Amino acid sequence: MTIMTSVMQFAMLPLQGIAQGAQPITSYNFGAKNAGRVKKTFRLLLITCLTYSIALWAAVMIAPQMFVKIFTSDSTLAQFASPMLRIYLGGLGLFGIQIACQMTFVSLGNALCSMVVAIMRKFVLLVPLIYLLPTLIENQVMGVYMAEPIADAIAVTFTAVLFTMQFKKALRKMEEPSNPIDTL
């Protein structure tokens, strides 16, 4: 499991870096009420994050042993961990959506939504699934590994729906004329 979480962290760091790099651009243009640039920045961020996460997902599906061998030289462990890595990171291809939306929430001054989707993924979904799935399937260990991609898929769906609603709301807010008295 440590190998799999290490590979997951390895995958997450560049995604977070890309998304954090877009934050000041999005925030600046949101503050300047430049909706076109906010949309364009988000679109580019989403495409970049999604392309990266799909490419990494494909690499893990094609050659999981390559990633496992970064963290262990034990061939028996690598032989067991490689197919499990495919299962554990099954939702990685969609993870670019999660990160792009989460970081854009923060850029638009909506850190609460960002926190909600982060908590949703790990605590509301993953922890209960880790306990529930082993009771529902015969191979209990497989149930634990399957919890991660299932939680990821549900969380990405929830995030995309919430983001779509909040992003439209933020864009409408930018179109409203500002009241100079409110700035005093």
Q: Predicted regions: what is each one?
A:
Residues M1-A58, I62-P64, F95-S114:
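Small-residue-rich hydrophobic transmembrane alpha-helices
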